[in-house]
Amino acid sequence: CEGTEQLQQNTGGKSVKKGKILALLLAGVMATTVLGGCGSKGSDSSSSSSKASSDEKVLNFGCAMYTDGSVNTAGDENGGWNAMRYGITETLFKFNDNMELEPWLAESYTVNDDHTEWVVTLKKGLKFSDGCDLTASKVKEAYEHLKEVGPSGSAKPEKYLEFEATIDADDEAGTLTIKTSQPYANLMGQLSHPTMGIVDVEHTENFDNGTIGTGPYMIDSFNGVGVGYTLVANPNFREEVPYDKVNLLYMGDNSAKAMALESGQVDLVENITNVADIQKFQDSDDYTVDIATGVRCGFSWMNFDGVLGNKTLRQAILMAIDYDTICNSKTIGGLYTPGFSVLP
């Protein structure tokens, strides 16, 4: 599986804000949503609420751009990943670093013996960044929006929750009852996919660049394709938000991100996959490198032509390969771990 790296520049160990951002990103908590009070419409234009001040805590974050930076969870699969990665959306449940399911917006759930009826209890007192309460009806509305819009895009939400499922919301009890036509071994796990992030559908005007969610940051402005976003702290978030403002800057390749970090243009970058750059940062006390195992797999392919057209020879080569040595070679640099098949 492919590793994910986050790099930050240290300043003599004195910067509190830079010490917090890595944990924030690894937890998938860095959220972005839009505008003020409940009932106001989402926007991608600058908000007057984010005035710079001398004591403002600002993070400059260099990252890759996917699908023109869209945060539309229903329209594009990358949109869901962007929204959660930037911190716009959260899901009912999430997977921790050990790939164990744990509550996020939900408090708990129960399921019947047939695994066709799930009752989810929401945490109390949660709000969207526009001030609206997170209710069972709001969650139902978000899922119905995915059902309505999903077929016209690439997000394919039906992979995680069938369109035949019925959803009943009880706002007084704070519960959501989901009934499916077929058994789901782990529906809560599937609802943890970024595509299933909970959005305030009613008050979001611009789903592509102004989605309203429940996380610690909200979109102050979308600065353009290839440029990035300006994010500000969500005043309605349930916990303390480490930064007042995050400048999310799109950077085209690994080298650009590495150079931006070295020059001080940014404080944090992600997914540096050049082994030489990673080693350079790891060897310096000025930077912190955090590497976590991802869920993406890489493959090496054999040419079936010529000598390797012999199946027995290919099998012999596969049996002789030392996968640990390859994964830890100078070329791979430990960014991959040896995989295996569930089949014998």
Set out the residue ranges of the language-model regions.
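N-terminal lobe/hinge region of extracytoplasmic solute-binding protein
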Residues: G62-V111, I212-G213
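Surface-exposed binding/hinge segments that line
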Residues: T110, D114, A155-V201
